[in-house]
Every structure is written in C-alpha cells, then in structure tokens.
C-alpha cells in the first residue's frame, strides 16, 4: 500500500476516506466556515482543509461523485482535476451546478472523489509520419451509439 503524507490545514477538516473496502476513490469532504451556495450554471471553489505530498511518479485525480451528478447535476468542470506530485497547497474542488436549482454545500459534505495513480512520463520522438491503423483518424463517435458492436480484434 502506498503511503501519502497529509497535513490537516484546518482542525475541522475531514481527511479523505474510502467508503467501501474496494472503492477506487476516496471521498473528499468540504471544509467550510459557512455554507456555500452554488447557483445554476455557476461554479464554486470548495476547500478541503488538507494538503498532500504525493511521491514522485504519482498524481491524484479529483472526480465527481456519481450521486451528486445523478440527483443534483453537480460535477467538476475540469474532471479529472489533476494534483501533481510537486503541489503542496490546499486541495480544492471546483464544483459546477448544471441543474436548475441552487445547490447548498455544507461543512463535511462529500463533494468529490480522489484517486491516486501512477504517472508515466514520456519523451516525444518527432517523426514525419505515423504507422497506419484500421481506425486511422476515426473519433468523436465514429463507431455510433446503437447496440454493442462486435470486436474486430
């Protein structure tokens, strides 16, 4: 198991926790002095009250919580939000309200998930052409939306 250093910047901060035994993401809670109202089609920056020190070669991703998205149309506009290994500031979550009603965030509300993952650094080798493939430049829905297409692999 990977050990990650964490500092509680606010004594009221709730540290990230896995809600279930096999959860991939840890729930991240809002650390607020007063409620925050996210109006329809607006954003709010929500503090977590903690900072982390990731080992080199890792990142943390902040992702939306499915229940907030399903029931309230609350998401993260920059999902997944990346926390780099050299960032030492407070973890903050940008929430966006895609719904038609104001959404109130209270202290302790679980507003995002955080997944820690290994990151591979790459070196780009500039060439004049790329190898051909059966897909070529097909993208943006080129396989359609109906049914479950049979794999051609």
From Swiss-Prot:
Pathway: Pyrimidine metabolism; dUMP biosynthesis; dUMP from dCTP (dUTP route): step 2/2. It comes from the Bacteria. Keywords: Hydrolase, Magnesium, Metal-binding, Nucleotide metabolism. InterPro entries: dUTPase, dUTPase-like, dUTPase-like_sf, dUTPase_trimeric. The keyword S-adenosyl-L-methionine does not apply. The keyword Hydrolase applies. HAMAP family: dUTPase_bact. This enzyme is involved in nucleotide metabolism: it produces dUMP, the immediate precursor of thymidine nucleotides and it decreases the intracellular concentration of dUTP so that uracil cannot be incorporated into DNA. This is Deoxyuridine 5'-triphosphate nucleotidohydrolase.
């Amino acid at each position: 198991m990977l050990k990650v250093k964490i500092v509680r910047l606010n004594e009221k901060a709730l540290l990230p926790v896995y809600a279930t035994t096999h959860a991939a993401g840890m729930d991240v809670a809002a650390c607020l002095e007063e409620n925050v109202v996210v109006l329809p089609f607006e954003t709010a920056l929500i503090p977590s009250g903690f900072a982390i020190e990731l080992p080199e070669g890792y990142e943390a991703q902040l992702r939306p919580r499915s229940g907030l998205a399903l029931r309230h149309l609350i998401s993260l506009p920059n999902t997944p939000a990346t926390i780099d290994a050299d960032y030492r500031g407070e973890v903050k979550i940008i929430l966006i309200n895609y719904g038609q009603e104001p959404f109130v965030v209270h202290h302790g509300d679980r507003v995002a998930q955080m997944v820690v993952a290994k990151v591979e650094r790459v070196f780009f080798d500039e060439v004049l052409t790329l190898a051909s493939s059966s897909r070529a430049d097909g993208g943006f829905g080129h396989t359609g939306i109906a049914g479950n297409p049979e794999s051609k692999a």
